[in-house]
Amino acid sequence: KKETLELMETLDLEEPIDRDVYNVGFGLIHQQYDMGEQVGKVLGHGGNTTCHHSMFNYIPELDVGIVVMTNSQSAIGFYATAGMTVLVEYLKEKGIVVEESKAECEHIKCDSNDMVGKYATGLGMMEIKRNNKSELVTKVSKIPIRLCPCKDGYYQCTPVKVIHKIPIFKSSIQGMRLKPATYLGEDIMLFEQSGKYHKTKGVIGCKYERTDIPDSFRAACGNYTIADEMFKDIKCKCQLKVEGEVLVLEIAALNVKLNSCLKVVGEDLAILQGFGRLAREMVKLQKKDDGYYLTFSGIVFKKI
């Protein structure tokens, strides 16, 4: 109904995450994509199961939208990219100006330590600290970066190693910015990623919470393979490990790599640390006569 859609287009939250960053309202994600003032607010949603992926985005002010659906086991990254590509091309065809997004930002001098700390993200542990030059540094997907403060409160990622200063790497790294925030009492980390015609905004993770690792989980560490018959044809790598006294679950499948810090809540139960859809997802451990089994997101894995 029209009234339902109008309600979904409103953002009536007691405490929004950030007015300039995406928020989840009544079934719609607000401002996950920033395409500039000429385009206006972009709303949408998406979801997936193991073998099905779909997303849609639309612009109320322009009465324009796009829906992308697949039933491929390897298209989880494709459908979002394709959806935005088609939407941009449609807007350009209609004569609506879509400017290329710019990653350049004016840097300022800032001695704040608000960013310092350990964060649990979908890319694994992100530890932000100051080096011997008092610069904020960290690693994103094992790539060392420097964080430069910007006027709007964000910190722009800049490359450290010479090889990452090659234009193709440099533009990708500098296109990412991070910002600390507090939501409902929880310290979280916002991110902004500049694409060619839009900026993607969201939450990358939250402050890491230290957890004791019992012997049951230490003994279960190792490589796992899918035990479920219905998922046996899916190529998947799964590993449970301890890195620097941090319990980590690493899964690579369907063109997606998940590297999550775990919080142990029992001898055979842990949850993912982070923020968003996968945060607090349960990881169930079970020891049988033929070895260790691990259940995550409804899929059973067996230790190799």
Show where each model-derived region lies.
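Catalytic loop of the DD-peptidase/beta-lactamase superfamily, centered on the K-T-G motif
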Residues: K1-K232, K241-E243, E250-K257, K263-I304
